[in-house]
Design a protein with these regions (language model features):
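Beta-strand-turn-beta hairpins that frame and shape the catalytic cleft
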Residues: 1-4, 103-110, 198-199
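Core catalytic region of metal-dependent phosphoesterases/phosphodiesterases
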Residues: 2, 6, 11-87, 91
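Short hydrophobic-aromatic micro-motifs
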Residues: 5, 59, 108-117, 185-187, ...
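Active-site environment of divalent metal-dependent phosphoester hydrolases
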Residues: 10-14, 40-43, 64-70, 116-118, ...
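Flexible, acidic/histidine-containing loops and adjacent segments that form or flank the divalent-metal
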Residues: 60-61, 65-133
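Active-site-proximal loop/helix segment associated with metal-binding centers of metalloenzymes
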Residues: 108-177
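Conserved beta-sheet core of the metallophosphoesterase superfamily
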Residues: 172-231
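Short, solvent-exposed aromatic-acidic interface loops
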Residues: 231-242
């Protein structure tokens, strides 16, 4: 089975459709994990939500989603996102199929921003090197934070909400930290840094800040048999400039 990982559509459903179409995603035999940031920048976060509700097996939240969820002013932030606050809270606190901050697929750790070297000890000592246990710990800590609704001033020292946590982390040269050692990761949040792929840190942010002047572009990862590959490019477009979808994803455009 293949697992598609897509992130950072930011209100542009095309970034999800294009990735699934390019890879020939088949919901009958493939899985899809969405790795955060549905809101802000683009005009149609509801369209992004419709796609992930239909196709994603797991949904992770990103820092922009949490900005809406906990009423945190971040840049850029679109006013329409505030209307999704109750929806996001319900999803995060759902008893089953909850939206989370981390998951592990075939030994590969998936989060929105990445897990930093700050967590090396936690993975090895508290979780015995098991990425699934680390994901469970991160998720439990996140849910507890959402239930408590911490003030912004408390975020700096919070293990999930701080700049070193899996919602906000940016690796060198943006911070002093490197990715968690010895564990493959697929992440969004930060524009790709190719030099980090040899560290098994695979970055799939499609750079929604560039807009959709190129309507067929995509960037995503596929996990299969414990290996990760990143795909980036653009679909062929018809004369109207609309992406040409593959047949198995025809319904995604309806």
């Amino acid at each position: 089975m293949r697992t598609f990982v897509i992130s950072d559509a930011h209100g542009y459903p095309e970034l999800i459709k294009n990735a699934l179409a390019h890879g020939g995603f088949d919901p009958l035999c493939d899985a899809f994990v969405y790795a955060g940031d549905l809101v802000d920048r683009g005009p149609d976060p509801e369209g992004c939500i419709e796609l992930i509700e239909r196709y994603a097996a797991e949904v992770l939240v990103g820092n922009h989603d949490v900005g809406v969820l906990l009423d945190l002013p971040i840049f850029p932030q679109e006013s329409r996102g505030s209307g999704l606050r109750l929806f996001l809270r319900q999803k995060v606190l759902a008893a089953s199929s909850a939206w989370r901050v981390a998951t592990a697929v075939e030994g590969v750790l998936i989060t929105h921003a990445g897990v930093s070297s700050h967590y090396d000890w936690v993975l090895q000592e508290e979780c015995q090197g098991d990425p699934a246990r680390l994901a469970g710990l991160l998720n439990a800590t996140f849910v507890a934070a959402v239930e408590r609704e911490p003030q912004v001033r408390e975020w700096d020292d919070h293990p999930i909400l701080s700049e070193d946590g899996p919602l906000w982390f940016r690796p060198r040269p943006y911070s002093y930290l490197l990715p968690l050692a010895g564990r493959a990761q697929v992440v969004g949040h930060t524009p790709p840094i190719p030099e980090l792929e040899p560290l098994d840190f695979y970055m799939i942010d499609p750079c929604a800040f560039e807009g959709m002047a190129d309507p067929g572009r995509y960037r995503y990862a596929v996990i299969q048999a414990g290996c990760v590959r990143v795909e980036e490019g653009r679909l062929g477009c018809d004369v109207a400039g609309q992406p040409l979808s593959k047949p198995c994803l025809a319904e995604a455009g309806r």
